[in-house]
Structures are given as structure tokens and as C-alpha cells.
A protein has these predicted regions:
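Cytochrome P450 catalytic core segment centered on helix I
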Residues: 219-293
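Cytochrome P450 heme-binding "Cys pocket" and the immediately downstream C-terminal segment
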Residues: 330-334, 443-473
Length: 487
């Protein structure tokens, strides 16, 4: 054979061998992938759920991207029961007993993939994102007095001042009459009220959103944009990149930013730094309580920031939901109005123009309290999955009287909306807004203040508002109403 021919054939033979090995490698990797998928599927095959949930988490990611997780969870729960698989390694429950077991039994840890994605700062945790159980519980004890009000005696007064600003804003700019109908976005006004209230409660001074009748510093928009970006990062699975040393700083907000959430951070941090630099400051607010209980330095900055962020957003869905269902339900509206009028008539609450009802007085109005509870059931402020990781070795939970084994490492989350609308717990009319199911006292007075002074009517009953779910928090907007003075 010609030697030249052998020299020419050698590279070709080498390429053939390389191609065959590459093909074997591809087949091997594909086989390992299939085996791994089958193993993951088999771990939770005893738990009902959509077939695809055992192999892919993309439907779950899609629901997060569409800000529609709660409706998606509810649909799965309706079909597969109170314990259902929603992703290869994630199960969702609507059982209060199972969720109480998961959150109270030692060994369960908050899932890093979810809670770390909710960090506001680069590689820094707060009480909301801390997954170390001991650190989380310790920080909660430090913050509790300032959050509950026991360490912040001026909390009610601070909220009342903002409530008076809200009433003044409505009366001075948005009062409709027979001659003119003036639409008002109630959800946005409530947002201004919340932002001013939480800043007054936390930092001792309202930000002035109600006085300016606007998002004067862009804080609301920047917070909402941050929540949307966080949801997108979590859904697409790249939120971990925000926590990478050095590089992650480029992807997260910073107090050095001139716009967006970083601007909100800078304002909050400046207030905290000013307080820390003046230890003799005798103001009584949540931040002062935090500092008195040992939360200082960067920790004080982080906790004040999350307290401001969550406090300005979380209650909005419940408050808007309560008012929406009262305004759109003539029977509930009339009963609540009658109770409030009777209380004012008998001296159990101040009459219109004679000041604000106190928290203690509001707790003595049973139908008001039932309405608030029903609103919280219908529109829970926080609806995220908030998963816990099953401890090593696994655990057994009881679902509707039957034991169900959960392998170690599996994530267990909850669907609050579906849980609060279970017909076996709340009755066959669980999807209806009916305060009579409660009649138990609870805190709250904003609905009382608004309903005692004004009459409301929805501008568009067919589409009364817009909502979207971001990181388990409902963002509510475009709740247009007409407000008239009560005669």
C-alpha cells in the first residue's frame, strides 16, 4: 500500500475514533440524565400532582413569571388535594395542620433557593431572608417589641396622623357630587397612606406622599420594580447570580444608585445612620426599639429597610380587598354602615368630624372585626410559597388522617389563598365574601374611618382593579372609585 495513502488515512481514522467516542459520551450523559430524572421522579411518586411536575419545574417557573402562582396553586390543589407536587423537588400543601407541623418542628429549614432570592442587599440577610433558624429566631425576638407596638407607644398616634392626612386629601381633592364625578384610584391613595404610615412608625417621620398626593420620591415605583425584577430572577433561576462575590454587586441595588430601589435604600440608610450617630435621641419609634434591643450598625440598616419595604407593600392587598368587597356588596356595606352609625350614636365611637376612632374602640365593633377577618382571608397580605426543606432522613406528616412520607431535602411550601378557601374548613360558600362566618375581634380601623365619613362607588365594577403577585406579595393598582360626602 502506498505510504502516502496511509498518511492521509491516519487523521481520518483518528477523527472516526473521536466521533465514536463523542457519540458514546453523549449517549452516556443522556443516560445519566434520564436515570437522574427517574430517580427524582420516584422519590415523590406517592404524592399526587400533574405528571409533568415530576420531571420539570418550567410550568412552576411560568406561573411565577405570569404573576399568577396563587391561582395556579389553587387549580392544582382542587384537582390533586391538600398535598400536591408542583415541581420535581417541591410539594405544596393547603393543610393548616401540615403547615403548622412544617414550620414548628425542629429540623426544617427555610429553603435557600427561595429566601436568598428575596434579599434586598448584596449578600446580606435580614429577618425575612435569614435561613439559619437560630439567627432568625434571635433576630425576631429583638425586633418584636418595635413591630408589635409594645416598644413603640406612639405607633397608633403616628398612624392616626397619616389617616387624617388621607381623609383630608380625599375631602379636598376627590369629593364627587351631583354636579361632578371625580374618579380616584383608591389603591394608590392607600399606598401613599401605607408608605407614610410605615415611615412614621419606623423612622419617626412621614415621607409626605399624602401631602404631595404622589409618589414624591419614586419610592413606590422603585419598590414595585424591585419586586418584579426579583420575581423574574427567581422564576428564571438566576437569582443566585446576584449573590456572587464582586460580580453580584453589579446586579443588585445599591444606596449609591441615583434612581430605582437604590435611592430608597439611601434615604432609609441615611435616617438610620443619623439615629445611630445620636445615641441620646429620645424618639419613640420602631427604629429606636430595634436599637435598644441590640440591633445596630449594618443590621439596623437592613432591618429598617425590610420593615419599610414590606410594611409599605404587604397590607395593600388586604386593605384594598376589604374595601373592594364592602363597596361592591350592598348588604355588607349597609350592615357595616349601620354598626358604625350606631356606635357613634351611642358614644362608643366618635361621630364624623369629632376625631378618629381608637384601636380599642374599633375592637368593640364585631361586624367591623368580622369584615376585616374576612378580607384578610380573601386577600391575605403575603401569599408566597415560603418553602421549608425537609430534614435529612425525611419526615412523616398526616394529610387528612393519612400518613405521608417526605424524603429529606424535599421542599414543602404552602398556598395561603387555597388554604383559606377550603370548603371543608370555611363552608361551601368559601369563595364568597361573608363576614358573618367570623364574628371574632381583631385589630383594624381604616375601613371604619373611611366608611364613617364617605360613600363609595366603583367606577368600573366589571374590572375594579389590577393585581399581580410578585415574590408572594400582591401589587394592587387602578382601583378607581367615586367618593361622596355622607349627609
Amino acid at each position: 500500500m502506498d505510504p502516502l495513502f496511509n498518511l492521509v488515512r491516519l487523521p481520518t481514522s483518528f477523527m472516526d475514533i473521536l466521533s465514536e467516542n463523542a457519540l458514546l459520551l453523549v449517549y452516556g450523559l443522556l443516560s445519566l440524565y434520564i436515570v437522574r430524572k427517574v430517580q427524582v421522579y420516584a422519590r415523590l411518586r406517592h404524592i399526587s400532582g400533574p405528571f409533568w411536575a415530576g420531571f420539570s419545574d418550567w410550568p412552576h417557573r411560568k406561573a411565577m413569571l405570569q404573576s399568577d402562582c396563587e391561582a395556579w396553586y389553587a387549580g392544582i390543589s382542587e384537582e390533586h388535594g391538600p398535598m400536591a407536587r408542583v415541581a420535581p423537588n417541591v410539594v405544596m400543601t393547603t393543610s393548616p395542620d401540615v403547615w403548622a407541623h412544617v414550620t414548628n418542628k425542629p429540623g426544617y429549614k427555610r429553603s435557600d433557593w427561595f429566601f436568598k432570592a428575596m434579599r434586598s442587599e448584596h449578600r446580606r440577610d435580614n429577618v425575612f431572608t435569614q435561613t439559619d433558624v437560630e439567627k432568625h429566631d434571635g433576630r425576631r425576638k429583638q425586633l418584636a417589641p418595635g413591630v408589635s407596638g409594645s416598644g413603640n407607644p406612639n405607633m397608633e398616634m403616628a398612624v392616626n396622623e397619616c389617616l387624617e392626612e388621607l381623609v383630608h386629601l380625599i375631602r379636598s381633592k376627590y369629593m364627587s357630587s351631583d354636579a361632578e364625578m371625580i374618579p380616584m384610584d383608591l389603591a394608590r391613595k392607600l399606598q401613599y397612606f401605607l408608605l407614610d404610615s410605615i415611615s412614621a412608625v419606623t423612622l419617626g417621620e412621614a415621607l409626605g406622599s399624602l401631602q404631595g398626593d404622589g409618589d414624591t420620591h419614586g419610592y413606590i415605583k422603585s419598590t414595585e420594580d424591585g419586586l418584579v425584577m426579583g420575581t423574574t430572577a427567581l422564576a428564571l433561576g438566576f437569582s443566585w447570580m446576584c449573590q456572587v462575590p464582586l460580580f453580584g454587586r453589579l446586579l443588585t441595588a445599591s444606596p449609591k444608585d441615583e434612581a430605582g430601589f437604590g435611592r430608597f435604600m439611601a434615604a432609609c440608610f441615611a435616617s438610620v445612620d443619623e439615629r445611630l450617630a445620636n445615641p441620646t435621641d429620645e424618639r419613640s419609634d420602631a427604629l429606636a426599639s430595634f436599637i435598644r434591643n441590640g440591633v445596630t450598625g449594618d443590621d439596623a440598616r437592613s432591618e429598617a429597610l425590610i420593615f419599610m419595604t414590606v410594611g409599605a407593600i404587604n397590607p395593600l392587598a388586604a386593605m384594598s380587598g376589604i374595601l373592594l368587597h364592602v363597596i361592591s356588596n350592598a348588604r355588607v356595606y349597609a350592615l357595616l354602615q349601620r354598626e358604625i352609625d350606631d356606635a357613634a350614636r351611642h358614644g362608643k365611637a366618635p361621630s364624623a368630624g369629632k376625631g378618629l376612632i381608637t384601636s380599642a374602640q374599633a375592637k368593640q365593633l364585631p361586624y367591623l372585626q368580622a369584615t376585616i377577618r374576612e378580607g384578610m382571608r380573601f386577600w391575605p397580605p403575603v401569599v408566597g410559597l415560603f418553602p421549608r426543606r425537609v430534614p435529612r432522613g425525611g419526615d412523616t406528616v398526616v394529610v387528612d388522617g393519612k400518613p405521608v412520607f417526605l424524603p429529606g431535602g424535599v421542599c414543602v411550601g404552602r398556598s395561603v389563598s387555597a388554604m383559606y378557601r377550603r370548603k371543608d374548613i370555611y363552608g361551601n360558600d368559601a369563595d364568597s365574601f361573608r363576614p358573618e362566618r367570623w364574628f371574632e375581634p381583631d385589630a383594624g380601623k381604616l375601613a371604619d374611618m373611611l366608611l364613617r365619613n364617605f360613600g363609595f362607588a366603583l367606577v368600573n365594577p366589571i374590572r375594579p382593579w389590577k393585581t399581580r403577585n410578585t415574590l408572594g406579595i400582591f401589587l394592587t393598582s387602578d382601583m378607581w372609585v367615586h367618593v361622596t360626602e355622607r349627609l
